From Swiss-Prot:
GO process terms (BP): translation
GO MF annotation list: rRNA binding; structural constituent of ribosome
Protein name per Swiss-Prot or TrEMBL: Small ribosomal subunit protein uS8
Primary role: One of the primary rRNA binding proteins, it binds directly to 16S rRNA central domain where it helps coordinate assembly of the platform of the 30S subunit.
InterPro entries reported for this sequence: Ribosomal_uS8 (IPR000630), Ribosomal_uS8_CS (IPR047863), Ribosomal_uS8_sf (IPR035987)
Recorded family membership: Belongs to the universal ribosomal protein uS8 family.
Naturally occurring in which organism (per UniProt): Klebsiella pneumoniae (strain 342)
Keyword Cell cycle attached: no
Taxonomic path: Bacteria, Pseudomonadati, Pseudomonadota, Gammaproteobacteria, Enterobacterales
Keyword Transmembrane helix: no
Keywords of this entry: Ribonucleoprotein, Ribosomal protein, RNA-binding, rRNA-binding
């Protein structure tokens, strides 16, 4: 049986891994998942990530904790296969009044809502992270 929403599965693995205080989580890799992991690393929500394997590549995310607490307080899927959510540059949301990020897929790649606003780009809102 094929997976219906691999991005929601990725976010759930991160959420569950941090709830169980795991050091790292692994999942099947894709270009979009690697791009999202790169944004999460740049913004300081995960420690690191790496892709291993050639035939069936696996993405391993090293989770980040601060004083024993998970850095990611909440991670929520927004646009999903059954209901895509697109926003123009002036409609991009601010998550937790700017304390969190919205991961946006634009024509120039996957980036934060802040970076998309500065570049003057809109796109598909993938998820909110705080």
């Amino acid at each position: 049986m094929s997976m219906q929403d691999p991005i929601a599965d990725m976010l759930t693995r991160i959420r569950n891994g941090q709830a169980a205080n795991k050091a790292a989580v692994t999942m099947p890799s894709s270009k979009l998942k690697v791009a999202i992991a790169n944004v999460l690393k740049e913004e300081g929500f995960i420690e690191d990530f790496k892709v291993e394997g050639d035939i069936k590549p696996e993405l391993e995310l090293t989770l980040k904790y601060f004083q024993g607490k998970a850095v990611v307080e909440s991670i929520q899927r927004v646009s999903r296969p059954g209901l895509r959510i697109y926003k123009r540059k002036d409609e991009l949301p601010k998550v937790m009044a700017g304390l969190g990020i919205a991961v946006v897929s634009t024509s120039k790649g996957v980036m934060t809502d802040r970076a998309a606003r500065q570049a003057g780009l809109g796109g598909e809102i993938i998820c909110y992270v705080a």
